[in-house]
């Protein structure tokens, strides 16, 4: 997607966590294109949030069509999110959101829901009058605070993420974290 997405934000955090300093992040709008890029040697890895509506399709396509596998998983909070509305709109009627975020709020308050492929497209649509409100980053509202306001703070979401690559890490056995960060309530089993 465009610059500033949670995918870019979280990918940067993941690379730093793994100590990878020389990687270049290339943003794409279509995960199937990303798989083709890995297959053709144009990319080494791809990161996808596991709550993305196309995730199951991407995992299956990666495995069965390209021989690409999920090689790592992790959990990371998103950017701070909220319902951002154009100033001057008293009763918002339209709400833009990325389909994976639909359960973050009660959408019944709006007459129409408009789906977009990235929350980073929402501020532009708000500023252009395409919709009244949108579920996007709070930093977008801050950047355009003269034109946009925050109606609801959603906060961050701890999302699961998948890393795709060519080298399969599972040889038929369970692969799980042994980093010692397992939540305490899971340790009692």
Language model segments and positions:
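Domain-level signature for soluble enzymes in the chorismate/prephenate branch of the shikimate pathway
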Residues: 1-189
């Amino acid at each position: 997607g465009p610059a500033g997405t949670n995918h870019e934000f979280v990918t940067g955090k993941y690379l730093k966590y793994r100590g990878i300093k020389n990687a270049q992040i290339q943003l794409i709008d279509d995960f199937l294109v990303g798989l083709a890029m890995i297959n053709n040697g144009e990319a080494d890895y791809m990161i996808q949030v596991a709550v993305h509506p196309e995730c199951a399709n991407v995992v299956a396509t990666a495995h069965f069509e390209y021989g690409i596998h999920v090689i790592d998983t992790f959990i990371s909070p998103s950017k701070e999110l909220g319902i951002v509305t154009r100033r001057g709109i008293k009763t918002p009627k339209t709400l833009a959101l990325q389909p994976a975020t639909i359960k973050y709020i009660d959408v019944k308050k709006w007459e129409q829901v408009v789906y977009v492929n990235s929350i980073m497209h929402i501020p532009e649509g708000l500023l252009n009058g395409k919709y009244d409100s949108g579920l996007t980053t709070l930093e977008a509202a801050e950047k355009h605070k003269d034109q946009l306001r925050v109606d609801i703070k959603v906060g961050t979401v701890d999302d699961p993420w998948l890393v795709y690559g060519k080298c399969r890490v599972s040889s038929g056995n369970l692969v799980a974290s042994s980093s010692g960060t397992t939540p305490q309530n899971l340790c009692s089993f």
